[in-house]
A protein has these predicted regions:
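Core segments of cupin and vicinal oxygen chelate
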Residues: 6-8, 12-55, 92, 100-112, ...
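Short, conserved beta-strand segments within well-ordered enzyme catalytic domains
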Residues: 15, 49, 59-61, 75-79
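Conserved donor-binding loop and adjoining core beta-sheet/short helix segment
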Residues: 52-53, 60-69
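Hydrophobic, ordered structural segments
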Residues: 65-132, 136-148
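Short acidic, gly/pro-rich beta-turn/loop elements at beta-sheet edges
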Residues: 24-26, 60, 70, 88, ...
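Short, charged/polar, Gly/Pro-enriched secondary-structure boundary elements
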Residues: 55-59, 119-121
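Short acidic N-proximal helix/loop "leader" segments that mark the beginning
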Residues: 1-6, 123-126
């Protein structure tokens, strides 16, 4: 299957922040048949890329010591052509920028924000790393869903910030 064409505003990546990266690698490796490549520790903080059949499907990263009480969490990233403009749109539409846009050397720009209901979502502006290379197949992401405490506010937020066309 060719790599997917990912439109702005669409999910393009997931990663797991975990307290035990070795256990996570073993678990998902056995469950999905993932293989791993760990990036340069100095440049990328030891970020691990998961691949299925040689194609990127997800990332994993070890939580810092100061995050010890925080549960392990999967994050979804939405594609953006301009992470700075997206961060501004987030703030202008009732969201909160938790982590301002930052450069990931050679790979792209990322940011983490809370939508108008407080749900955390990432933004990825690609350069070298475009996002998923495999989707909707066994061992790869197939569906993303937002559980929210305020459905109408969430729908309006994603329509206004990402131009989503929703049928509700």
């Amino acid at each position: 299957m060719p790599s997917p064409e990912i439109s702005p505003g669409a999910p393009c990546w997931i990663d797991l922040m975990t307290s035990d990266i070795a256990a996570a690698r073993q678990f998902y490796g056995e469950l999905f048949g993932w293989e791993y490549e760990t990036g340069d520790a100095e440049k990328y903080g030891g970020y691990t890329t998961a691949r299925k059949n040689g194609k990127t499907v997800a990332g994993l990263m070890q939580k810092d010591a100061d995050q010890a009480g925080m549960p392990d969490v999967w994050s979804t990233y939405l594609r953006s052509d301009d992470a700075e403009a997206t961060a501004s749109a987030v703030a202008a539409n009732g969201g909160q920028v938790y982590m301002p846009p930052m450069d990931v050397p050679e790979q792209g720009h990322m940011a983490i924000f809370g939508d108008a209901t407080g749900a955390a979502v990432g933004v990825w502006q690609p350069r070298e790393m475009k996002g998923y290379e495999l989707v909707a197949e066994p061992g790869a992401a197939a569906w993303h869903e937002l559980h929210t405490k305020d459905y109408d506010a969430a729908v309006k937020f994603y329509q206004d910030v990402f131009g989503w066309d929703t049928d509700v």
